[in-house]
Amino acid sequence: MIRKEIQDTELLAHLSSIFKNEMTGFVMADGLYRGALFNATDLVNQMAVQWNHGPLETMILAQAYIAAALLIPSMKGKEQLQLRYDTEGPAAGFCVEADSTGYVRGYILQDQIPIEKPLESWDLSPFFGEGRLKVTRFPEGSTEAFTGIVEIRYKNIAKDLSWYFLQSEQINTAINISVQFDSKARIVGAGGFFLQALPNIGGKIKPKLTKELFLKKNGLFEASELLKEKVEHAFSSCPSLGQWYAEKGNNEDLIFGLFREFNPVVAYTRSINFECSCSKERLIDYVRNLGRQEIEELKAQKDHVIEITCHNCASVYKINKDEV
């Protein structure tokens, strides 16, 4: 990947002053819930400078990158996945990838979305039509991929991803994605929140919370309706994550502020970055393995340099024909 540098000194100063690009994972309610809160401001700013899209396309792709990052906590061991959103609307959708090592990359399907009038809000539903959301997982060492597909229901990336978990994996999951622009169309804050109910815990574990928040069935503890309502209310009380990070908020203050009564425990912190495995050497090998007709067409071109753009990260490679 050829990483482009952010040149805006005012934006760079802002990015250096806010909470770091970090995901904080936690468990709460004696293990009945797990969550992850991610400050994605650095990640989506690198995406924005790399792709150089317009504000609308940048907003969609920023949300897509954050959505892919929020899938990383659901990975089992070493794994890669692809999140694809195909719609009949003007935006067409996106295709993004994430890896358990902590990278995200990908692209929007329509890089110049037609709009009929100036944007009045960041409601993206008018640009998403009917379609499908697909998650394909590639576990390390497995010879086959595992794919889950759901119909797009809300035309909202976060809500449709929650719907995917409920329908395809039968897990209640709440997702919040937020991106904040300033008056100059710069991303000054961005983040994502993932909260998921876990299977019932074993009977040997004695809940530390009050008894009315738990039920015991067949020797297993599970969340009562009261606990579910309280957790849902707490999650829905989350402020705008884009604004939270833009105003120098941090992860732990928000986690403990929202969920203190459920005794959250931080399980890990990790970085998630925009990275791509493309390289000049890989693309030279790609060109060498083209079909005979394609190679002859390249030879016939007057230019002595072949220019190739990576579709996952927008890196532009210039390859001398002599290198091929």
Where are these regions (language model features)?
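Cys/His-clustered metal-coordination modules, chiefly Zn-binding fingers
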Residues: 233-324
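Interaction interfaces in information-processing and related assembly proteins
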Residues: 2-268
